[in-house]
Amino acid sequence: MAITRKNLVAFCFTILFIISSIHCLPTTARSPGYEIGPQRRRRVTCFSFSFCKPARGLASCDLFCKRLKFESGLCTGDLEKCCCIDYIN
C-alpha cells in the first residue's frame, strides 16, 4: 500500500487533533501556588490551660478552640499549650 499525500496529511491532522485534545483536558488536582483569589493568612492564638494533658485527650484542645469560634486547635509539642488557628482573608 502506497502512502499518498492525502493519507499522510490525514494522518498528521489526526495525530495533531489527538495531542491537542489530550493537552487541553482539565486536571483534577489543584496546583500549588495557583489559587484563585487572595491567599489566606493564618492567625495563631495560644492558651496555657491544661487542655493538652494526656488525661484529657488531644481532641479537647480542638473542641475548646471550636467553641471559641476558631477553625481548629492543636497542642504544642511539649503538651503545655493549646494553640487555636484561625484564617484571615
From Swiss-Prot:
Subcellular location, record wording: Secreted
Domain of life: Eukaryota
Keyword terms: Antimicrobial, Disulfide bond, Fungicide, Plant defense, Secreted, Signal
Gene Ontology cellular component annotations, sorted alphabetically: extracellular region
Example GO biological process: defense response to fungus
Positions of disulphide bridges: C46-C84, C52-C75, C61-C82, C65-C83
Signal peptide bounds: 1-24
Main location: secreted
Family: Belongs to the DEFL family.
UniProt-recorded name of the protein: Defensin-like protein 103
